């Protein structure tokens, strides 16, 4: 699988763009909770929480490896479903291509909102901030050539696919659940987005069933060998955390064992006049450093900046953009 992973992904996406109108032939579908913990109080009463929620579909004649989808910050499995402008999302596109698909709401998010921590959720009037940070444009203006439909209904749907985290952000809790999923379903390919990127890096260390990773605009907690954290990994993100983390060399080597492809979209500025945009420029550059370090050690990591291969106007959500 390793030598042809990148080519296969490209060919599949091109082929699946030619979506036919035949009825989807689904052999099996269902849902379940995975992972999590059980708390017990002094009276012996129980509380089940911190699990993930999984919805899956298996097409007739499914391919060997299923696809597991991890969403990003402030999102849930809707990321991979129908796009804000009403087109089929990756869920159906890859189902039509013959892949079993597993859409996950990570612990403390969406349908898996039964967290184990006390938390107060208040409305955050921040949608214009996310419009900028997700690189649709600079509110209220859209970027020229952006691959995002410019109508009120699309923007309304876009904002309504956001959901809060019911508890603190905890990559260990998230990755425990994803690892349990891979252990349950067997070998598969992990498709991650944004905050799901570091969740993917963590999950890879906890299961042998991840055969490849495709990550869209990963951000945060990039693992580097102890004592080799590059200066570019030491910057503090808008989330007030350092972008890179140090891990033992034996752990770092785990990332050389599966093919990894990473994608970044368009409108990445060359200066830091808009920190919420420049953060993604820095992440693209950092992932190129990360890829080189792993490839020098025998890894198979490819970083693709979409404008450099002729795809322009992509936002932070390339999987749901118009192109």
Descriptions of predicted regions:
Residues 13-15:
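C-terminal motif of bacterial Sec signal peptides marking the signal peptidase cleavage site
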Residues 19-62:
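N-terminal cap/lid segment of alpha/beta-hydrolase-fold proteins
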Residues 168-189:
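Conserved acidic catalytic loop of the alpha/beta-hydrolase fold
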Residues 191-200:
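Gly/Ala-rich beta-loop-alpha elbow adjacent to hydrolase catalytic centers
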Residues 218-298, 302-304:
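The feature captures the conserved acid-bearing segment of alpha/beta-hydrolase catalytic domains
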Residues 313, 317-323:
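Catalytic active-site module of serine/aspartate enzymes centered on a nucleophile-bearing elbow/loop
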């Amino acid at each position: 699988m390793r030598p042809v992973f990148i080519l296969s992904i490209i060919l599949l996406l091109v082929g699946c763009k030619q979506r036919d109108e035949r009825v989807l032939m689904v052999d099996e579908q269902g849902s379940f909770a995975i992972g999590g913990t059980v708390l017990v109080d002094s009276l012996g009463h129980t509380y089940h929480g911190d699990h993930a929620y999984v919805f899956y579909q298996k097409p007739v004649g499914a391919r060997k490896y299923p696809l597991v989808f991890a969403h990003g910050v402030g999102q849930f499995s809707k990321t991979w479903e129908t796009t804000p402008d009403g087109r089929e999302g990756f869920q159906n596109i890859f189902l039509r291509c013959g892949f079993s698909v597993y859409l996950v709401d990570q612990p403390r998010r969406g349908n898996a909102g039964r967290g184990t921590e006390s938390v107060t959720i208040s409305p955050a009037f921040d949608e214009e901030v996310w419009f900028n940070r997700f690189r649709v444009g600079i509110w209220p203006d859209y970027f020229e050539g952006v691959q995002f439909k410019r109508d009120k209904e699309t923007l309304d749907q876009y904002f309504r696919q956001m959901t809060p985290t019911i508890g603190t952000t905890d990559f260990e809790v998230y990755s425990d659940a994803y690892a349990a999923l891979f252990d349950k379903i067997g070998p598969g390919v992990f498709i991650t987005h944004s905050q799901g990127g570091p969740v993917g890096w963590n999950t890879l260390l906890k299961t042998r069933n991840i055969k490849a990773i495709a990550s869209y605009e990963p951000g945060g907690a990039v693992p580097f060998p102890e004592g080799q954290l590059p200066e570019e990994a030491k910057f503090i993100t808008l989330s007030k955390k350092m972008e890179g983390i140090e891990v033992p060399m034996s752990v770092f080597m785990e990332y050389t064992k599966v093919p990894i492809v990473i994608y970044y979209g368009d409108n990445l500025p060359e200066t830091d006049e808009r920190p919420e945009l420049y953060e993604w420029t820095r992440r693209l550059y950092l992932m190129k450093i990360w890829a080189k370090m792993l490839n020098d050690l025998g890894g198979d990591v490819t970083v693709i900046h979409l404008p450099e291969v002729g795809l322009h106007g992509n936002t932070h959500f390339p999987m749901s953009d118009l192109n």
